[in-house]
Amino acid sequence: MISMLRCIYLFLSVILITSYFVTPVMPCNCKAPETALCARRCQQHG
């Protein structure tokens, strides 16, 4: 039971991390960032 919950938790965290890193890259427009993630991404990369 515990191992199953741990697997689910790992699976969800991996999805969240990948979506966090992939989503801002695709639609971002640094001249007019739509979201806070985009703005942060653009600040980091100049």
Swiss-Prot record:
Keywords, A to Z, come to: Amidation, Calcium-activated potassium channel impairing toxin, Disulfide bond, Ion channel impairing toxin, Neurotoxin, Potassium channel impairing toxin, Secreted, Signal, Toxin, Voltage-gated potassium channel impairing toxin
What are the coiled-coil residue ranges?
Answer: none
List of residues that carry Histidine amide: H45
Where is it located? Secreted
Which residues, if any, are the signal sequence?
A: 1-27
Q: In which tissues is it expressed?
A: Expressed by the venom gland.
Per the record, the GO terms for biological process are:
negative regulation of inward rectifier potassium channel activity; negative regulation of potassium ion transmembrane transport; negative regulation of potassium ion transmembrane transporter activity; venom-mediated perturbation of biological process
InterPro entries from the xrefs? Bee_toxin (IPR035361)
Disulfide bridges in this chain: C28-C38, C30-C42
Which intervals of the chain are annotated as region Essential for toxin activity? 40-41
GO MF annotations in UniProt? inward rectifier potassium channel inhibitor activity; potassium channel inhibitor activity; toxin activity
Query: What GO terms fall under cellular component here?
Result: extracellular region
Q: What is its main location?
A: secreted
Keyword Secreted carried by entry:
yes
What more does the entry say? Negative results: No activity has been detected against the following channels: KCa1.1/KCNMA1 and KCa3.1/KCNN4/IK/SK4, Kir3.1/3.2, 15 voltage-gated potassium channels (Kv), 10 voltage-gated sodium channels (Nav), TRPV1, three ASIC, three types of glutamate receptors, and three nicotinic acetylcholine receptors (nAChR).
Q: What does this protein do?
A: Toxin with unique selectivity to KCa2 channels. Potently blocks human, rat and mouse KCa2.2/KCNN2/SK2 channels (IC(50)=27-140 pM), and moderately blocks human and rat KCa2.3/KCNN3/SK3 channels (IC(50)=0.6-4 nM), and human (IC(50)=0.7-12 nM) and mouse (IC(50)=28 nM) KCa2.1/KCNN1/SK1 channels. Does not show any antimicrobial activity.
Query: This protein is called what?
Result: Apamin
